Regions:
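Preference for intrinsically disordered or flexible, low-complexity segments
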Residues: 2-188
């Protein structure tokens, strides 16, 4: 996405790799999220699927049905990646990523700005949430990392991240080897 001199997006085009949510996706997501409060109506599209065809990352609408803002554009839904994020967080990788962000201020600032523009571009009401990635204060704390789940979801779902090299190194494989997550009746 290009940003012109006035800070406005010169080209708001949605990624062509996003796909609509299918009936099978809805069934699977309801099973995966049966222990969470998960509002399927907030889902705009599937941003990424694994090689087994299951949703890994969802694109969420920037506003809930009642109109309140929802700043998280990309939502990680893959159980394998969810577990991997938890493992990395337990190894204090959030701090490491924040330190890396501090060495890439221009890239991180652009990432937050383009994320906000993308989020606004899919808004049905034109809601303008004045924050960066996942609701992070992109002005006051641009290097803050809320969680690795948000980072992984944005990296995989948007295919754009200022620390893509670091994420690739830390995550290695971005999916499980057997598609077990498609069977939600037993743990993956």
């Amino acid at each position: 996405m290009d940003i012109n001199a006035s800070g406005q997006s010169a080209d708001i085009s949605l990624p062509t790799f996003w796909t609509p949510l299918s009936e099978n996706d809805v069934i699977l997501l309801r099973k995966r999220n049966r222990r969470r409060r998960f509002d399927i109506s907030i889902v705009y599209a599937v941003a990424a699927r694994c090689s087994f065809g299951f949703p890994q990352v969802l694109v969420c609408r920037p506003e809930r049905k009642e109109g309140s803002p929802f700043p998280t554009l990309f939502w990680l839904t893959c159980p394998y990646l969810d577990r991997k994020c938890g493992e990395l967080e337990s190894l204090h990788k959030i701090r490491e990523l924040e330190e890396l962000f501090s060495t890439r201020p221009t890239e991180v600032a652009r990432w937050h700005k383009e994320y906000a523009l993308l989020r606004k571009s899919i808004s049905e009401t034109g809601i303008d949430i004045p924050t960066g990635v996942g609701g992070i204060d992109s002005q006051g704390a641009p290097n803050a990392v809320k969680c690795l789940h948000l980072q992984a979801a944005t990296w995989i779902g948007w295919r754009y991240h200022p620390a893509a090299d670091w994420l690739q190194k830390e995550f290695g494989a971005a999916e499980c080897s057997n598609g077990l997550c498609g069977n939600c009746d037993r743990p993956p």
